[in-house]
Amino acid sequence: MMARRTVDFKKLIEQLRARATDKAEALNTVSQLEIGAVDAQDVTASAVRAFVGALPSSGYHFGFVRQNVVFYLLSHATVQTARDPLYAAEQLHEQLDRFLRHQHDGGGDEDRLPFYHNGATLTAFQKLLQTLREIQTVIAEQSGGTAAAADLIASNNASTERRGKKGGSSSGGQQPLVRRVITQLETAATEARPYVNCRAVAELLDLTYQRLIYWACTLMPYVLFRRDTDTELDTVLLMHFFYTHYRSVNGDLAVEFQNYVKNSVRHMSSFVSSDIDGDQKPGAEHMRDVSYKLFVGNLQARDASGLMFPIISTRISTVNLYLSPERMFFHPGLISRLLSEEVSPRANLDAYARVCDRVLEDHLHTPRRVQRLLDLTQMVMRLVELGFNHDTCAAYAQMALIQPASQKSSLFVSEIREKLIQIIYNFYTFFMCLYVYSPTFLFDHRRRLILEQHRSTLIGSKEELQHVWSNVTLNVNTHFAVQYTEEDFEAHTKGATEAEREYLYRDLHSKWGVHLFTLRPSRGAAGAASPLPPLDGVTRSDILRECALVNLNEGRVNYASLLAFSHHPEFPSIFAQLVVVTEFSEIFGIPQGLFQAVGSPRLFALIQLCRVLLPEQVTLYQNLVSIYNLTTFVKHIDAAVFKTVRDCVFDIATTLEHLSGVPVTPNVDLLAELMARSVAHNLYTTVNPLIEDVMRSSAGSLRNYLRHTRLCFGLARGRARLSEDGVTVYVEVQGQYGLRVPTTRFVEQLRELVRRDRLLAENLRGLNERLLSVRVRVRQISSDTEEVSRHAKGHRTVAQMSKALKKTASKIKVLETRVTLALEQAQRSNGAVVTAVQRALAVFDVLSRENLERRGAQLCLTEATSLLHRHRALAPMTWPAGTGVAAAAEADRALREFLEAPWESAPQPPRLRMTPDTDHEESTAGATSVPEVLGARYEPAHLAASDLLNWYIVPVSQAQQDILSSIDPPAGSTSVSLPPASP
């Protein structure tokens, strides 16, 4: 359970009163507030008076706190714990104002510290609160669609014609209002710049910026982005995109979409696939939702039926015809194909390559430094026009993540894939940062965590993508250039003493971290940094003796005796070696279960020691504070948090080696436990989604392929015989089932079997690659633990975690191998069956009407006979010995369903009776000279075999004449009975 970040203000005041005469203890007490925070709801006017009265009158920065208590409390108060942070801030202002009204001197020196004295700080805080309240009221009213909101829109955009009321596509009229509110907020942030590092001010700005950004980014009406040149496919994809992601301002699209589909349904059939396995083609899983809505003509429909329906095609040749290239990012199926490189080498990708080049050039290769929030919102609109928002970028990033690092594709296809990854990763991190952006130190921490965490997730150990992440980092730091400069600090602290500057800088450093400038002494500053006793006859032995007595087991800092030695030239080295290194090692050897109760207080005491006795080691202090905050107040230890703690630990070890002059090996007990939590969190948040994606993307294909394999096995076990008249196929399944199937239908289904085998093999090609991506991700997680492992050889927890990760990777590898072998075996056996089927179909193809007409009966019959002879020469197909009865029964059942289901009521080919009228109709109807082999045929007369023998005996000349003439008797004549044949 994580500790409460805020301190008990009343309890802290009581501690100050009890230790008022001990300045060191007073510093320890207020440090709790400065490292943690005070809940703004606990601050009352009486509590502030008690706090000021309990502080020592001199020493350290106590004088600054007493004279500028309003600034001090705003700097260390938090409003995040309140249900309504802005209301809590307003109540805080009221209490501080009440406190000042009862102060006799008003506090502070207006001439010496014009920004930080109580009056100026409270006035600026009040003005900021008023502005933030106005802005949040506008946002709430706009989101709620109240009458006041309508009035505001009308006043800001009276000339704008809107297409509808709330829920319609009318937010284009709100853009002027958005720009006005953004300008108002940026002006307020600029005016509050001297106080932007006060925690309460930073949290309020942070909250308002995020609400404003979210509101502005939801106002994306379809009418602002559609074009007259959009194709039918463009229009369908755009309507679905804007209705799905921006429904609040595109409510009328539901009706518009329904009418559009109804009027354009004939044109839309060209870019959908009606194949039975259309939803299993590469990239098709990402088109299922929009395809279903197109199929039913309703944007509000949800696919819960489980039925099959036409899927919008992801085939490059089809997409090229019906999708505008600049709309490519609205088609997730296309992006999935390009990322997976499921592209024919002959596919025309030039248009998509040009779009990628243009996006990279316009947005990423030469980024412009963003100075205003308005610039960011304008960039969002440009990205939405391309088809990007937070959700689509997250989906595309996941697509890229599950793809292997390298594939055997053409160089051009691989280049497009790399460009897509660069675009996707850049815009994904852009939106991740955008929705948590504010010009404060709070965002600076988030930005670093986002970059660190997503570098581990998206790039990992893929060396070929390291340059992509360098570009991502450059663009994020350019688009979100948030910092507090040395010029700002000098302007705001003009007139402060050196002790006050040191306190203010240390406070800044604890909030901004290593990105902050280095403090230089001010020429005009007065006063010492801390009250040091005189140094009289202090020796190295004295320092050694005092340092040896330091014990932080009780979590309290008693450094009064050491303070006299702290400016001795040898003190930093001795103190670091005897105290800091020892405490540092012992603290990080405390188990995580005891760390909150034992380790955290000792770490806090060590922080205080370093702050007072090693004031120049600001980086050491900052790293200790970072570890304290992350291990004490952060609930979820993800990869970014673990890496931050790990880096801080090793940075501290390096600093202590430099100070003490002796090698420092950090204790990794706590790091090992944090690593275990980080790995578990990482597996849950990054590997599990990959496995779920594998199951979701491949489960359907695997089920279909299993049914297909059973069917092929059933065909191998069965025997088929063609009837004498060629109309019917008789099928025996191991002599148990007798099936009678029309030949035409039988041939059609065999062709479907061959086609499905090809499609299923194509769909399963990416399964092994997805399994490989899971194994690669586990390997990346393992690499995150390597640095700790190098310093903890033989450590039990580290060894167990490494063993578990290796075991996980090994199991995934075994699964990958088993799946690969099973698929290869199935493909070989299925391939043998399909090859046999193709040989049989080849005979029917050779004897097709088109072939007979083009090549003649003699050549076709000769070729068909040759095919039959070659086929009969092959060994009969067998199945593995020991095949289970259940498996054989399932295969036989699959074959029976395959043959019976479509044809139980199928019509037989028509029969023609051999009559004079029939022959006359055939000869005069202009029919083709060659009939279909499997088409309508004559039905012979039902005569005994003896009646059919010797019925036509004539001289050769007569036979030739009869063959060349019609067998129809002349009209009006009667049939002539033939004389019986002579023996």
Swiss-Prot record:
Keywords in alphabetical order, please: Host cytoplasm, Host Golgi apparatus, Host nucleus, Virion, Virion tegument
Q: Name one GO cellular component term.
A: host cell nucleus
Task: Tell me where in or outside the cell this protein is found.
Answer: Virion tegument; Host cytoplasm; Host nucleus; Host Golgi apparatus, Host trans-Golgi network
In residue numbers, the region (Disordered) covers 901-932
Q: Where is this region: Interaction with large tegument protein?
A: 474-983
Predominant localisation class: virion
Q: Compositionally biased, Basic and acidic residues: which spans?
A: 914-923
Q: Name the InterPro entries for this protein.
A: Herpes_U30, HSV_ITP
Q: Which GO terms describe its biological process?
A: virion assembly
The UniProt subunit note reads as follows: Interacts (via C-terminus) with the large tegument protein/LTP (via N-terminus).
Annotated family: Belongs to the herpesviridae inner tegument protein family.
What is its biological role? Answer: Plays an essential role in cytoplasmic secondary envelopment during viral egress. Interacts with the capsid via the large tegument protein/LTP and participates in its transport to the host trans-Golgi network (TGN) where secondary envelopment occurs. Modulates tegumentation and capsid accumulation at the viral assembly complex.
Q: What is this protein called?
A: Inner tegument protein
Q: What species does this protein belong to?
A: Human cytomegalovirus (strain AD169) (HHV-5)
Q: Source gene?
A: UL47
